[in-house]
From Swiss-Prot:
Gene3D superfamilies linked to this entry: 1.10.150.530, Aldolase class I
Known catalytic reactions: adenosine(2503) in 23S rRNA + 2 reduced [2Fe-2S]-[ferredoxin] + 2 S-adenosyl-L-methionine = 2-methyladenosine(2503) in 23S rRNA + 5'-deoxyadenosine + L-methionine + 2 oxidized [2Fe-2S]-[ferredoxin] + S-adenosyl-L-homocysteine; adenosine(37) in tRNA + 2 reduced [2Fe-2S]-[ferredoxin] + 2 S-adenosyl-L-methionine = 2-methyladenosine(37) in tRNA + 5'-deoxyadenosine + L-methionine + 2 oxidized [2Fe-2S]-[ferredoxin] + S-adenosyl-L-homocysteine
Cofactor annotation comment: Binds 1 [4Fe-4S] cluster. The cluster is coordinated with 3 cysteines and an exchangeable S-adenosyl-L-methionine.
Listed cofactors: [4Fe-4S] cluster
Family: Belongs to the radical SAM superfamily. RlmN family.
Organism of provenance: Cupriavidus metallidurans (strain ATCC 43123 / DSM 2839 / NBRC 102507 / CH34) (Ralstonia metallidurans)
The protein, known as: Dual-specificity RNA methyltransferase RlmN
Length: 384
C-alpha cells in the first residue's frame, strides 16, 4: 500500500503544517511550493536549494503525483484534450483552449456527475466519485508544463495558461472540500498566481455552497441556467427541484456582494424547440431583472441518445438580440474542439457508463422532456 503523502493534495497552509511535522521551518514550504507549481519539479533531487537531508526525508515520505494521461489529442483549432486515469476504471478530461490573448484550461472536479443535466453527455455517464485536491490541481500542473514544453513561455515570461474554468466533468460545489484548496493554489503567488477574476467556477446552482464560497474564496462565478422558468429547468437541470430559480437568483445577488467581478455569467445551452424561443428570452429578462449579469449562449453539442438538436444560427441570433436590446451583454460561444469531443457538454470520459441511480435520486427522478407548450405551467400543475 502506498503511504506516501502526495504534495499536490496540500495547499499553502497544509504544506506548511506538513513541513512542521518534519521539523522544518515555514519558508521550506514556500520553497517546495515554488519547485512544484512554478518549476514543475516531480522529483525531490531536482530541488537543489533544499538541504540534502530534507530531500532525502521527502523521498521516503512524500511524492508529487498527478493523474496519468491515457490519451492526448489536439484539435484542428488547437484545442488540446487529455483523458486522465484517476483509478478504479475512472477517467476524467482536461481541455486547453487557446485564444489570441489568453489560454484557458477547463478542469474537472468529479469522475462523472450526479446532477445529470439533460443536454450533457457527462451526466449520462453517471457519478463515480469526487476527485481529490491533488487530482484537481494536478490537471493544471500537468497541463501547464505540457503546454510550456510545446509552446514555451510568452515574450514577457507569462504562463501559457492564464485562465482556469471549473467547467469540466462534475459539479464543483458538490466536491467543495477538495475544490477550494485546489483553487487556493491557483491563486497563490508561490504557485500559479492567478487573480480571482481569472479563475471561474461554474455551478448548476448548489445554493448553500454558493453562499459558503462567497465567504471562503469568491472567485468569478458562472451559473448553468439553461431555462427561463422552473417547469422547464426541473427537466433540463434536475437540481432545480431542490433549489428552484427564485432561490438561485437570490443566491446570485448575495454572491455579488463578494465577487471579484460585478456580474454573474449565466450559461445557456441552446436547444432547438426546447428553450430557444423569443418568449424564453423575454422570460429571462424578467428572471434576471435585478441580477447584474451577462449571458453566454452555448450551441448544443449533440451526442448519441440525447434526443436533442442544436438551435440553428438564426434562432440563436434572434434570441441573443432580445437580450442585447435590453442592455445585457450577450456572447455566443464559439464551438471549440468538437472534432475531439472536447466541446461543451461532450466531456464524457470515454469510459463505461457508471450510472449511480442512488446519487441521481438526490435530485429527483428523470422525467421526459417537457414540451415547449407546457414549459410555463405552474409548478403544481406539472407532472411529477
Amino acid at each position: 500500500m502506498n503511504n506516501l503523502v502526495n504534495l499536490l493534495d496540500l495547499d499553502a497552509d497544509a504544506l506548511t503544517a506538513y513541513c512542521g511535522e518534519l521539523g522544518e521551518k515555514p519558508f521550506r514550504a514556500r520553497q517546495l511550493q515554488r519547485w512544484i507549481h512554478q518549476f514543475g519539479a516531480s522529483h525531490f533531487d531536482a530541488m537543489t536549494d533544499l538541504a540534502k537531508s530534507l530531500r532525502e526525508k521527502l523521498a521516503t515520505r512524500a511524492e508529487i503525483r498527478s493523474p496519468a494521461a491515457i490519451s492526448d489529442h489536439t484539435s484542428s483549432d488547437g484545442t488540446r484534450k487529455w483523458l486522465l486515469d484517476v483509478g478504479a476504471g475512472n477517467a476524467v478530461e482536461t481541455v486547453y483552449i487557446p485564444e489570441d490573448t489568453r489560454g484557458t484550461l477547463c478542469v474537472s472536479s468529479q469522475a462523472g456527475c450526479a446532477v445529470n443535466c439533460r443536454f450533457c453527455s457527462t451526466g449520462k455517464q453517471g457519478f463515480s466519485r469526487n476527485l481529490s485536491t491533488g487530482e484537481i490541481i494536478g490537471q493544471l500542473w500537468m497541463a501547464e508544463f505540457a503546454m510550456r514544453a510545446q509552446l514555451g513561455r510568452g515574450p514577457k515570461d507569462e504562463r501559457v495558461i492564464s485562465n482556469v474554468v471549473m467547467m469540466g466533468m462534475g459539479e464543483p460545489l458538490l466536491n467543495y472540500d477538495a475544490v477550494v484548496p485546489a483553487m487556493r493554489l491557483m491563486l497563490d503567488d508561490n504557485a500559479y498566481g492567478l487573480s480571482r477574476r481569472r479563475v471561474t467556477l461554474s455551478t448548476s446552482g448548489v445554493v448553500p455552497m454558493m453562499d459558503r464560497l462567497s465567504k471562503d474564496l469568491p472567485v468569478a462565478l458562472a451559473v448553468s441556467l439553461h431555462a427561463s422558468n422552473d417547469a422547464l429547468r426541473d427537466v433540463l437541470v434536475p437540481l432545480n427541484r431542490k433549489y428552484p430559480l427564485a432561490e438561485l437568483m437570490a443566491a446570485c445577488r448575495r454572491y455579488l456582494e463578494f465577487a471579484p467581478r460585478d456580474f454573474i455569467t449565466f450559461e445557456y445551452c441552446m436547444l432547438d424547440g426546447v428553450n430557444d424561443g423569443v418568449e424564453h428570452a423575454r422570460e429571462l429578462l424578467k428572471l434576471v431583472a435585478d441580477v447584474p449579469c451577462k449571458f453566454n449562449l452555448i450551441p448544443f453539442n449533440p451526442f448519441p441518445e440525447s434526443g436533442l438538436k442544436r438551435s440553428n444560427n438564426e434562432q440563436i441570433r434572434r434570441f441573443a438580440q432580445v437580450l442585447m436590446d435590453a442592455g445585457i451583454v450577450t456572447t455566443i460561444r464559439k464551438t471549440r474542439g468538437d472534432d475531439i469531443d472536447a466541446a461543451c457538454g461532450q466531456l464524457a470520459g470515454e469510459v463505461m457508463d457508471r450510472t449511480r441511480l442512488a446519487e441521481r435520486g438526490k435530485f429527483g427522478k428523470i422525467t421526459p422532456l417537457v414540451p415547449v407548450a407546457d414549459a410555463g405551467a405552474p409548478r403544481e400543475a406539472r407532472p411529477a
